Every structure is written in structure tokens, then in C-alpha cells.
Swiss-Prot record:
GO terms for molecular function: protein-disulfide reductase activity. The keyword Disulfide bond applies. It comes from the Eukaryota. The active site is at C29, C32. This is Thioredoxin.
Amino acid sequence: VQVISSYDQFKQVTGGDKVVVIDFWATWCGPCKMIGPVFEKISDTPAGDKVGFYKVDVDEQSQIAQEVGIRAMPTFVFFKNGQKIDTVVGADPSKLQAAITQHSA
């Protein structure tokens, strides 16, 4: 899982033809801390080889969070070819796993 630390990096990461999932989180968000390790664990599964895993701190990268329309944390957003293709809102491991499985197929 890589941290996105600039808007340019965000555009580069989301613009490719590989599906990427970005965890939009905040340091002060309890549920984010709870699901963070789950996100890391899923990235180490076979699905993780087919999907790029990234994190964005919404406080450090407010421009990205605003452009994507993040209103709650954590929010997991899937991108392919520069387009948002799916969103999972909240710290729900089974929903997150299901979406990652679906997009890695």
C-alpha cells in the first residue's frame, strides 16, 4: 500500500488501465484505524496483485479529497482509466473485500 503525496501522483496513479483502490482516511478517524490493517492485509492477497492499493490522508491532500467528493471517512474509491468506477463508504471489511474481489476478476 503506497501513500499518495501529491495531486500529480494521484492523477498518474488513477489514469492507468490497472484498477486502483484508494483508501481516503484521516489520522483522527477511529474507524479508519480499525480497517487500515484489513486494507493492508487484502493488498497481500492474490487480488492485491491485480489491483493497486493506495492511501490518501484527506487532511494533507484536501484538493484530491475535494475533487473525488469525499464526505465521510473511510471511503474506498476504485479508479480505472482516470474514471471513478466504484465506491465503498465506511469501515465494512466484507463490503471492501467484495468490491476488491469483483474488480480484480
